[in-house]
Regions:
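Bacterial N-terminal signal peptides that target proteins for export
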Residues: 1-8
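Cleaved targeting-peptide boundary
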Residues: 21-29
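Extended amphipathic alpha-helical interaction segments
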Residues: 33, 58, 151-155
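Compact alpha-helical subdomains of small soluble proteins
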Residues: 77-155
């Protein structure tokens, strides 16, 4: 029984590692490609949520209102990221949720590292980096998604 449990843990870790991503510019994708391709849709959702979580973590103590706004955007997008992952991997919502949050946590840490390096180099988390453009892109994508949700609800 212990061998099976150990094998399961190794397989779970390995599958999560294979699906984990590294940070890269998100702004290179168009809204059209996001809507037409489930894998791109997931990649953008995962990236934006991770970026929002990183900004939340870095700003919440000093600028609580700003941190809370990013946290709210994260909470808005989380279910859609989980659903997108569930769809492309054919997993249950609960399985996809676990994988999703592990991936987001890993990417968030990478964003924080990148932002801290950039902050030391340029005196800003975003100046001289693709991260500022990505943050704008993610904001526009989130705004579009919220609008689509409101329209689908008839509001």
């Amino acid at each position: 029984m212990i061998k099976i449990k150990n094998i399961f843990i190794i397989v779970l870790f390995f599958s999560n590692y294979l699906f984990a991503q590294t940070i890269e510019p998100l702004k290179n994708y168009s809204l059209e490609s996001i809507l037409e391709n489930d894998e791109i849709n997931y990649k953008i959702l995962e990236g934006c949520i991770s970026l929002y979580k990183a900004v939340t973590e870095l700003t919440i103590e000093r600028y609580p209102d700003l941190g809370n706004q990013f946290s709210e955007m994260t909470e808005t997008l989380n279910p859609y990221g989980i659903i997108a992952l569930s769809k492309i991997q054919g997993k249950t919502y609960k399985e996809a949720e676990n994988i999703f949050f592990n991936n987001v946590s890993s990417l968030k840490d990478q964003y924080i590292d990148e932002m801290n390096k950039n902050g030391k180099l340029n005196g800003s988390y975003f100046k001289g980096s693709f991260l500022g453009d990505d943050l704008t892109f993610c904001y526009e994508t989130t705004k579009y998604l919220r609008l689509a949700i409101m329209e689908s609800l008839g509001e």
